[in-house]
């Protein structure tokens, strides 16, 4: 019997498994797909390196970078290429995001005064944030409401919506600022003005590595290294968990009977002392429905958005724009049909053959859920129609790839933190049952890595307290 069954082989599940293995806890990981990694997927196509999902690790959240270093990939981490500039579309033009900002929020007003991204009225309203009192109500608030209240409607439209909500493929008026950007609400509570607080901070010297790192072969390298670090017999692909069964309460059992069984669509019934569900919240809901309807209902309430990534390659001569940055985001009011675009060959070294460019467009999300109903050809045409006038693209692409991510973007909307607390209270009724992944605590790679490893630590501690054999410091046969 395995001590732990991990259901789900995305980055959170793999990180959980890695930490369990590091602590000497026996486990088996079940992944319904033909490969591990979830939305982290990189492909090598005709000399191009295409990230179909996320392409970067955030330096300010070092958990992903630290894991790469542990996996022996530290010397392969590469920074973004200069100039490290992102753009925002307004009025059919691309405007550089003003320097001296934290996720678009100014740390100095000077660069914002000179930009053409905002009207003078909008700039004055942003500067007036210095005099906006802190909100007394400690209740949850949307990103849109927070930014409008503090910086004005123009900042909400052209900064918060494409940047803060856009990176989560969400609705700015529904996403929770407390769940996704707790730093902002904490600064407001402690200092009142965000502008004043950020201006008082010592001026940070940008690392020579910049704000983001990746790997030469894309972030898929990280997934391959994680899989290689685990015992081969511990990962079972193309295995769908269909039901979770509680055999008994999770107190120590002198007969070493399993506390749980995970039933698979192939007819197996796998015993375990503990189970971690590293699955989307709606899948978690289905698995726990038979043992706790309230927990299932809570998990089912977590909304998800579907997105598509459309990758294009062109000859360099076919693109008039200098592509002097990492890409651009598109405010909803622009109505172009895409959320953003990333210039991969300008952002990272060696992503395209010489005299070629590689870029991606992002489509769908909570802003445009019907886009996911389009065919691949329609998604590609929509994306190309949005890119062509902005970048001066002539001719047909040399390469086109469409990657669909159905219900893959968890939406931490207003009320998410209260729901998460209720989920954790419900889990307390089932010792030995754990959840992790983007539907619960954190949505990016660093957060999922951190939460997966923390969950593994909790499992190891719980097994040790329960005195489960082979729980810690002793490896099963598969782990030797």
Language-model-derived ranges and their functions:
Residues 12, 35, 282:
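Conserved Rossmann-like nucleotide-cofactor binding loop
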Residues 98-100, 322-325, 339-480:
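Conserved flavin/dinucleotide-binding core of flavoenzymes
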Residues 25-27, 275, 397-400:
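Hydrophobic anchor at the start of a short beta-strand
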Residues 2-29:
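N-terminal Rossmann-like FAD-binding beta1-loop-alpha1 element of flavoenzymes
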Residues 23, 237-359, 366-373, 377, ...:
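Mid-domain catalytic core of redox enzymes
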Residues 105, 109, 122-243, 249-255, ...:
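Active-site/ligand-binding neighborhood in enzyme catalytic cores
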């Amino acid at each position: 019997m395995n001590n732990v069954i991990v259901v789900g082989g995305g980055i959170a599940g793999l990180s959980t498994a890695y930490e369990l293995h590091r602590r000497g806890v026996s486990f088996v990981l079940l992944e319904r797909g033909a490969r591990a990694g979830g939305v982290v997927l990189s492909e090598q196509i005709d000399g191009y390196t295409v990230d179909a999902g996320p392409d970067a690790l955030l330096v300010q959240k070092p958990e992903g970078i630290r894991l790469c270093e542990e996996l022996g990939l530290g010397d392969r981490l590469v920074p973004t290429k200069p100039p490290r500039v992102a753009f925002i579309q307004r009025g059919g033009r691309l405007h550089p995001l003003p320097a001296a900002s934290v996720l678009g929020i100014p740390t100095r007003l000077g660069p914002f005064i000179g930009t053409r991204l905002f009207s003078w009225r909008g700039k004055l309203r942003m500067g007036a944030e210095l005099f906006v009192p802190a909100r007394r109500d400690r209740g949850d608030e949307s990103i849109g409401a927070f930014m409008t209240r503090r910086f004005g409607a123009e900042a909400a439209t052209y900064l918060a919506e494409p940047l803060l909500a856009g990176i989560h493929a969400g609705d700015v008026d529904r996403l929770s600022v407390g769940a996704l950007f707790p730093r902002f609400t904490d600064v407001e509570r402690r200092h009142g003005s965000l502008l004043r607080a950020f201006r008082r901070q010592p001026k940070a010297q940008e690392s020579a590595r910049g704000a983001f790192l990746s790997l030469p072969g894309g972030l898929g390298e990280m997934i391959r290294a994680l899989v290689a670090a685990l015992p081969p017999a511990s990962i079972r692909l193309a295995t769908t968990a269909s039901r979770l069964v509680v055999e008994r309460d999770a107190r120590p059992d002198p007969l070493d009977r399993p506390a749980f069984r995970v039933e698979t669509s192939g007819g197996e019934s796998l015993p375990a002392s503990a189970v971690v569900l590293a699955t989307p919240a709606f899948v978690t809901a289905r698995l726990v429905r038979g043992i706790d309807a309230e927990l299932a209902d809570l998990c089912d309430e977590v909304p998800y958005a579907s997105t598509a990534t459309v990758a294009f390659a062109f000859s360099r001569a076919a693109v008039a724009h200098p592509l002097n940055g990492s890409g651009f985001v598109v405010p909803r009011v622009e109505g172009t049909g895409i959320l953003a675009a990333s210039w991969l060959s300008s952002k990272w070294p060696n992503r395209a053959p010489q005299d070629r460019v590689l870029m991606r467009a992002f489509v769908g999300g909570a802003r445009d859920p019907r886009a996911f109903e389009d065919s691949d050809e329609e998604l590609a045409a929509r994306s190309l129609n949005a890119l062509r006038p902005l970048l001066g693209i002539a001719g047909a692409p040399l390469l086109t790839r469409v990657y669909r991510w159905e219900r893959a973007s968890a939406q931490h909307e207003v009320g998410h933190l209260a729901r998460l607390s209720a989920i954790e209270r419900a889990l307390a009724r089932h010792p030995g049952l754990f959840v992790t992944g983007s539907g619960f605590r954190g949505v990016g790679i660093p957060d999922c890595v951190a939460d997966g490893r923390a969950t593994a630590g909790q499992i190891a501690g719980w097994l040790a307290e329960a005195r489960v054999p082979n729980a810690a410091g002793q490896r099963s046969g598969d782990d030797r």
